[in-house]
């Protein structure tokens, strides 16, 4: 049975895209069939996946935005799925999503479009991971409505620790009104400079701020320049350097997540 997971935070720069790609890669090497949905008009997940191969992603036509437009216009085209490797696929996104979002905002049942699209795809996958924009608007609600679970990424800084209340409110409103089965799998702390006491203190603040009701994963993702290097060549950090500390951390996090099931 397919599990659909949204990776979310309304703040940018907290490791959403990096986590989505590397978590998907870890699930794939564990013999799972995984589909990535880039749902951010910046298209960073599309860039990181390596499918563009030098092409400007804003020139790509077969994106998630195109599919949503066909659903808005009652044509309902099947999405074009790009293969990253044998077990990992992606539906890309680019700047066209910004225009599509404007159409979504004035569409009937605007919250339901991504769910409708994924209904026809989920039987082909073990996991579908959705990378969202740093916002709290209609595309995030679409992702929540389509999902079974949410993983929240957070960095060990004051803004990240205090800035998730609005995200949690959006989650609760979506759960109440559209998707009663939606749950938060946990909070993953990323971008950790393990050398500093400040980071360690902020990790404790994040853990205590969520309380006992929301899991904060035991494994955290350390800072590593190798992560940006891996993104530049369209590889997961484990594929780029399996002994890197971030690669090991993403592997341990994936194991921790899977033990929850």
Report residues per predicted region.
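P-loop NTP-binding core
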Residues: 1-261
């Amino acid at each position: 049975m397919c599990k659909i997971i949204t990776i979310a935070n309304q703040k940018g720069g907290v490791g959403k895209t990096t986590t989505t790609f590397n978590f998907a890669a870890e699930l794939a090497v564990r013999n799972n069939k995984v589909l990535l949905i880039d749902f951010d008009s910046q298209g960073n997940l599309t860039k990181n996946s390596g499918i563009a191969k030098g092409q400007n992603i804003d020139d790509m036509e077969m994106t998630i935005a195109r599919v949503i437009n066909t659903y808005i216009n009652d044509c309902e085209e099947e999405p074009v799925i790009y293969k990253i490797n044998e077990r990992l696929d992606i539906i890309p996104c680019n700047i066209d999503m910004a225009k599509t979002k404007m159409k979504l905002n004035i569409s009937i049942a605007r919250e339901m479009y991504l769910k409708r699209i994924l209904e026809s795809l989920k039987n082909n996958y073990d996991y579908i991971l959705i990378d969202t924009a740093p916002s709290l608007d209609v595309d995030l609600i679409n992702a929540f409505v389509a999902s079974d679970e949410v993983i929240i990424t957070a960095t060990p800084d004051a803004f990240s620790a205090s800035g998730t209340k609005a995200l949690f409110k959006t989650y609760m409103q979506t759960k109440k009104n559209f998707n009663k089965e939606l749950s938060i799998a946990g909070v993953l702390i990323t971008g950790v400079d393990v050398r500093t006491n400040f980071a360690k203190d902020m990790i404790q603040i994040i853990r205590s701020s969520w309380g006992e009701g929301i899991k904060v994963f035991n494994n955290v993702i350390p800072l590593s320049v190798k992560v940006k290097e891996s993104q530049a060549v369209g590889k997961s950090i484990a594929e780029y350097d399996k002994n890197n500390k971030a690669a090991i951390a993403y592997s341990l996090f994936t194991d921790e997540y899977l033990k929850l099931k």
